[in-house]
Amino acid sequence: MFGDRQRPMVLVLGLGESGLAIARWCARHGCRLRIADTREAPPNLAALQAEGIDAEFVGGAFTPALLDGGIELVGLSPGLSPLEPALAALVAAANEQGVAVWGELEFFAQALRALGTSGYQPKVLAITGTNGKTTTTSLTGLLCQRSGKKVAVAGNISPAMLDRLAAAIDETALPDVWVLELSSFQLETARTFAPDAAAILNITQDHLDWHGSFDAYAQAKGRIFGATTTRVLNRDDAAVMKFAPAAGAADAPRTVTFGLNEPVQDGDYGLSRDNGIAWLVEAVDRDAPDEAATTTRRRKRDAHTPDIAQKRLMPADALRIRGLHNAANALAAFALARAIDLPAAPLLHALREYRGEAHRVEVIATIDDVDYVDDSKGTNVGATVAALDGLAQKIVLIAGGDGKGQDFAPLVAPVARWCRAVMLIGRDAPAIRDTLAETGVPLADHVTLEGAVHAAADLAEPGDAVLLSPACASLDMFRNYAHRADVFRAAVDEIAIDKGATP
């Protein structure tokens, strides 16, 4: 994968999970390594040394001098923002010298291409979006497994792609299907990545400090598509639909949409409601010839007017994951699996089986007919909007933390519609309070999450939910979102004990 270069000199910037994976991958291919990190002693340095990887380590600020000594390739960790001045100067210097800058995803794409010369041709499915990535990735992996495929799930979800690929090679167990969760950070440096099918679930404000603007963030998401990649797009999201090819465009890639309304284009997916029951459905042209995989049909672009029927797949209530947003995630996963011609029957069985991921609209207890819901992974406004609208019941919301410069205005409508009260915590509680004041919903400030949970429990009525969906990052008060969830769960356990219930 390194062409004709013998033992090329590679500079790896950043020693997080992906940086360590890049270093391991390069070392196994005989590369000489220089690893740089702004930290003098990054946590993964000990792991690198324990594995016996021979590498020069340089701690401290990045400078173009790191390229000295014959660097032929730069591996860039996804957590490093290209807008950071020192990194931007280093990357510019690399470009001037003709030194390629790859992220882990590009290393992975190049590795698959090299393996392809030996006959390895797996299917690759990829998922991105502001929210729902992990759920949809895990669900897609399960669907493919239940269809009899050997599957590897990797990327932003962990493990790192290169680590998973190395393990598969060592075990002589290369998968039939790769299912990759990809963040905007990982996609920023994508160059030749071209999966068989890829989905963008949604695009709302997030990571603007890293990308610099919403447009730059959205464009990074769009790098998930290659020229021939089947595009699976959320038609309810205008920012996502900008990646739909123009109608009638020559050589346009195959496109499938999903949404929470009835689909009207042959091969699209959505929800149909009949007698109070919501169904997951596929739009089918009654006049189209039968084919083994409906999503691989090319839409007719002639004068033919399709006679669309709504083919029922399963009731939405049969899903074990709650909320309309999760119905959309299920449709996206189903569309991806069908895009690589997997049969529908085992996919539908798997949809009924999947129980969801921790900290993602997860009901952790029901006490006195009040649901306690952990959505600590809801670290941006879009995630909290989805949780509120998806639960569709009266809610006492707990929100707040580090808002990362977001606009909280999208919370106004769902809070006004669904919330009985809002408990505010963390650094940006005042900003959220100012935004939500117009809703007329009672707002209360709390110094601790524990206090907010107990106050929420006192306000909740039977049939309500107490929802931790902060719309913010956690680092102003907690180690990470999982620590925040642990504190929430401990408080719920206390409430259960106080009420003589079993959480």
Swiss-Prot record:
This is UDP-N-acetylmuramoylalanine--D-glutamate ligase. InterPro entries: Mur-like_cat_sf, Mur_ligase_C, Mur_ligase_C_dom_sf, Mur_ligase_cen, MurD. Its EC number is 6.3.2.9. Pathway: Cell wall biogenesis; peptidoglycan biosynthesis. It comes from Burkholderia lata (strain ATCC 17760 / DSM 23089 / LMG 22485 / NCIMB 9086 / R18194 / 383). The keyword Signal does not apply. ATP binds at G129, T130, N131, G132, K133, T134, T135. Its main location: cytoplasm. Cell wall formation. Catalyzes the addition of glutamate to the nucleotide precursor UDP-N-acetylmuramoyl-L-alanine (UMA).
